[in-house]
Amino acid sequence: MSGRNSLLDRRALFTTGAAAALLAATGASAGEPPRRGGRLRLALSGATRDDTWVKGDGLFMQVARQGMIFDTLTEVTGNGILKGELATGWQASDGARQWQFDLRPDVRFHDGSPLTARDVVASLQSVLTEAEVAVQDDLKVQVTLATANPDLPLLLAQSRYVIRPAHAPEAGIGTGLYRLRRFSAGRQVLAERVETHYKDGTAGWFDTVELVSIPARDVRAQALSEGLVDAADLPA
């Protein structure tokens, strides 16, 4: 972690995604090659004692889900480019009412089970309530919308569309860069870097990431200034 304190811009978090915000919080300059290791501690708002891995829309759980524990089919990079995450490509038909997503092969959940189209269908059916999501084959998913939406790939980059294992959707098991080690609702998330990941060499520079819930802005600011955390949610 750089010696410089870092502040998380809430607007950047929502426009570039939690993963990009986590990497931006390192304080490393654009020309400085990233180095692996250490712990990143983030002080965030928005946590509640009712948070679960399937419930909780505050900033705290958004960061915990996306960029740490789980992946989505698509992602928006730090420079605003839409690209595939668990999807390697997608095609639209019927005027953007029907979509096919091709899944990345050889991806595994943190419990060792392989990612398949069935996991994607189970994950998306619960949130795309007005769409039909169907398995085409093990690595292909078809989404049929009630009305055309040319922005569906962008929509699916949001944290509510993370992909969970169909056999354990509420367990905090994902395909993300970090494996869950400790979760205390409304208080803390601790996760450690997985040994191998398809994003190796491009993301996930820390050995561990810890999210700490601090509801009060002034207390988050104090924790940051005293070096108790490495980055904090301090909206202007």
Predicted regions and their residues:
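N-terminal secretory signal peptides and thylakoid transit peptides that target proteins
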Residues: S2-A20
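Aromatic- and charge-enriched surface segment that lines or borders ligand/interaction sites
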Residues: G89-T129, Q136, Q142, A223
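Ligand-site clamp/hinge motif
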Residues: T196-A236
